[in-house]
Amino acid sequence: MSAPDGPPLPAGPPPARVVAVVGPPNSGKSTLFNRLTGLRQKVANFPGVTVEQHVGKLKIEDSAELDVIDLPGVYSLTPRSEDEQVTHDVLLGRMPGVPKPDTILLILDVTNLGRHLVLAAPILALGLPTLVVLNMADELERRGGDVEAESLAQRLG
């Protein structure tokens, strides 16, 4: 099959878009991944639970779907451990058999925002469309705190 006056149209559905779920350990990445994909990745309150990437599908329209990759928790993109190396390699498209993400969901725990924001600059520097998700706001509120989301958005660009 070909388009009028143009090259042949590709056969089959377009390739799935790839979304990487990234953030520090225990920021809620795997919980969000499970909610989006309906899968049940192990969720625990200690580092190193996700040491490899997990991939699930998120159906967004009748026929469109996203590949969602749950990556190990990291504090930086300078790999110093096996789990940081996995995240680094996937984000840069260097992991064999895993497509480079088109988009990043950066999950930040607002109860540890000062420490977790350090990861935002190198993630944003990758130049991929990035959605920063401020997680655990209910816990921060319970502690009497709040986050200025609009101010933070302006500072992050």
Report the location of each language-model feature.
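Conserved G1/Walker A P-loop phosphate-binding module
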Residues: 1-82, 94, 98-103
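Conserved C-terminal guanine-recognition region of P-loop GTPase G domains, centered on the G4
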Residues: 58-63, 86-157
